[in-house]
């Protein structure tokens, strides 16, 4: 961006203190090491740099929602909430407060304006192996108009080569894979430390409601899970559902995981202002899934029904369903 003639400023968000979350032994995203790396790159580029403290907002809008979704029986995607409420909301406010027009990040996606409708479009990255459009579906028209993704048309090896040629300290830094505030993957342990709660054992039940074993707390299990159940039932069984009030986890054969229909709420439309009737598009209900043909229909109260042409495995409450028309994101919402 600096080479293109823009007036640039570097900024990184402090979203939590590792020690506060019991993660002092990990180098997570937004860690002290990340702040140091960002500051060094800004110094090399000869641009101003600030660390912005959003710890309280992050706790309220991301961490506490993450916990509430698990406690309600869903499986959250906190990266989507962080993008929606932190990176492209708080940081845009920060940019404007400093007289700057855009937030620029390293996400793999593209933004273009539709010359016919004037709407800002979110599109898949050209380097599809790294495409992140799924976790960016919640961006508003205002946010898209003031955001740039310069890496959206590039591939990862080329980007690393440029970073090495510039001598950036983070040129060979590993990609982040885990939830930033739960880097060890033990989200239940994190939740218990954070809330002071203990999530009690309960019953595994089959599809007919018969008790078939004991589980270690319903929050530990997600739809479609097979590993770690500790059940010997003569055939493989999978998590098919949870009743959080009764603290039961329903298990059954893999065939019970397949369904064609879901309902989603909290929808954000991007390429269209609203859904006014049935539309045949492609949709995916998890990050690593390939989009599948489906029909979407508007329901009352802003809800949306998605009916896939073919049954899909383990559609999970709390995850996002994102709709595509080719490489353009039509919109997305949270599975109910």
Named regions from a protein language model:
Residues 1-137, 148, 157, 164:
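ATP-dependent adenylation/nucleotidyltransferase module used to activate substrates
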Residues 104-111, 115-336:
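AMP-forming adenylation/ATP pyrophosphatase catalytic core
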């Amino acid at each position: 961006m600096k080479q293109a003639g823009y007036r640039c400023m570097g900024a990184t968000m402090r979203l939590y203190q590792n020690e506060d979350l019991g993660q002092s032994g990990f180098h997570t995203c937004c860690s002290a090491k990340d702040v140091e790396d960002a500051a060094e790159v800004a110094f090399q580029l000869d641009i101003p740099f600030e660390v912005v403290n959003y710890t309280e907002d992050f706790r309220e809008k991301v961490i506490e929602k993450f916990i509430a979704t698990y406690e309600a029986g869903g499986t959250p995607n906190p990266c989507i909430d962080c993008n929606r409420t932190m990176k492209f909301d708080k940081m845009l406010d920060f940019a404007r407060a400093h007289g700057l027009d855009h937030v620029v990040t390293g996400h793999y996606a593209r933004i273009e304006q539709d010359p016919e409708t004037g709407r800002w479009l979110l599109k898949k990255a050209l380097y599809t192996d790294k495409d992140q459009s799924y976790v960016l579906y919640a961006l508003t028209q205002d946010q898209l108009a003031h955001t740039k993704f310069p890496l959206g048309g590039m591939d990862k090896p080329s980007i690393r080569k440029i970073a090495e040629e510039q001598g950036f300290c983070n040129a060979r830094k590993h990609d982040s894979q885990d939830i930033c505030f739960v880097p060890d993957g033990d989200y239940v342990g994190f939740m218990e430390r954070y809330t002071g709660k203990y999530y009690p054992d309960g019953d595994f039940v089959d599809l007919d409601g018969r008790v078939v074993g004991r589980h270690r707390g319903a929050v530990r299990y997600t739809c479609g899970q097979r590993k770690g159940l500790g059940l010997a039932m003569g055939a493989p069984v999978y998590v098919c559902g949870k009743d959080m009030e009764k603290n039961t986890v329903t298990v059954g054969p893999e065939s019970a995981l397949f369904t064609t229909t879901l309902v989603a709420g909290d929808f954000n439309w991007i390429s269209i202002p609203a859904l006014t009737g049935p539309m045949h598009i492609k949709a995916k209900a998890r990050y690593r899934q390939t989009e599948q043909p489906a029909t979407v229909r508007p329901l009352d109260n802003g809800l949306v029904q998605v009916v896939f042409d073919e049954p899909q495995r383990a559609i999970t409450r709390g995850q996002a369903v994102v709709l595509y028309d080719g490489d353009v994101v039509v919109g997305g919402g949270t599975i109910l």
